[in-house]
């Protein structure tokens, strides 16, 4: 907090943006304070069975770019090393660096989808061979909750990037603005894939429920048949 306060004084950052940057979690957003562009991107990584979310707050001015990170840096730390190792990249302007950061944040979304997809497809194969147990059903609902929240994050990030593409903001040049289209397309692709995975989960659950209903129906008919067989000798004995 003291370091952020010193940065606020040095670069004359808006108090509302500083206050927001100190909070560990908040949805993606884009605000303009005078000549300062304030962007919040949501980072994500898969930890065990759950998606862990972080936050990257980015202050972009005409001659500075400041990031405040909450959560694991992951590949973002490597991006900083790459940019610092190549002064020509920094020389392209702060808007180019902002694009590089958002692009790297979004790049981390695809591995999350791929790992969850492997789990879902394995469950789909099991459902074709055998009945899903209670643990499997609980897993389906858990994955559905994780993917639904992930989809909300993707939607908010897509809206943020679309604003950067379509709007006119301080520190974002007309030359760099089209580059954000690539980030927007990347988010849209992951959104579509997550939608498809949610549909697969629903299909797996419905198919499993249908098989279970059929199994119960078969058992019920078998019990009814045995009951009829047992009832016949009883009826004969009573004559």
Residue ranges and their predicted role:
Residues 12, 185-239:
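Hydrophobic alpha-helical transmembrane segments and their immediately adjacent juxtamembrane loops
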Residues 1-175, 179-182, 186-196:
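Peripheral, non-transmembrane regulatory/ligand-interaction domains of membrane transport proteins
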């Amino acid at each position: 907090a003291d370091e952020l306060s010193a940065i606020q004084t040095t670069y004359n950052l808006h108090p509302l943006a500083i206050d927001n940057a100190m909070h560990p979690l908040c949805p993606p957003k884009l605000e303009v304070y005078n000549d300062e562009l304030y962007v919040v991107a949501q980072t994500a990584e898969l930890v065990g069975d759950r998606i862990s979310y972080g936050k990257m707050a980015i202050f972009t001015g005409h001659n500075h770019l400041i990031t405040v990170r909450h959560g694991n840096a992951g590949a973002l730390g490597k991006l900083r090393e790459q940019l610092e190792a190549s002064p020509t990249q920094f020389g392209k302007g702060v808007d180019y660096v902002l694009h590089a950061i958002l692009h790297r944040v979004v790049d981390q979304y695809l591995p999350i989808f791929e790992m969850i997809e492997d789990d879902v497809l394995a469950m789909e194969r099991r459902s074709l061979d055998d009945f899903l147990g209670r643990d499997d059903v609980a897993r389906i609902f858990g994955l559905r909750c994780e993917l639904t929240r992930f989809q909300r994050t993707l939607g908010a990030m897509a809206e943020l990037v679309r604003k950067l593409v379509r709007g006119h903001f301080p520190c974002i040049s007309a030359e760099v603005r089209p580059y954000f289209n690539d980030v927007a397309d990347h988010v849209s692709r992951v959104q579509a894939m997550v939608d498809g995975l949610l549909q697969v989960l629903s299909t797996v659950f419905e198919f499993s429920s249908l098989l279970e209903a059929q199994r119960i129906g078969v058992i019920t008919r078998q019990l009814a048949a045995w009951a009829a067989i047992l009832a016949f000798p009883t009826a004969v004995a009573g004559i």
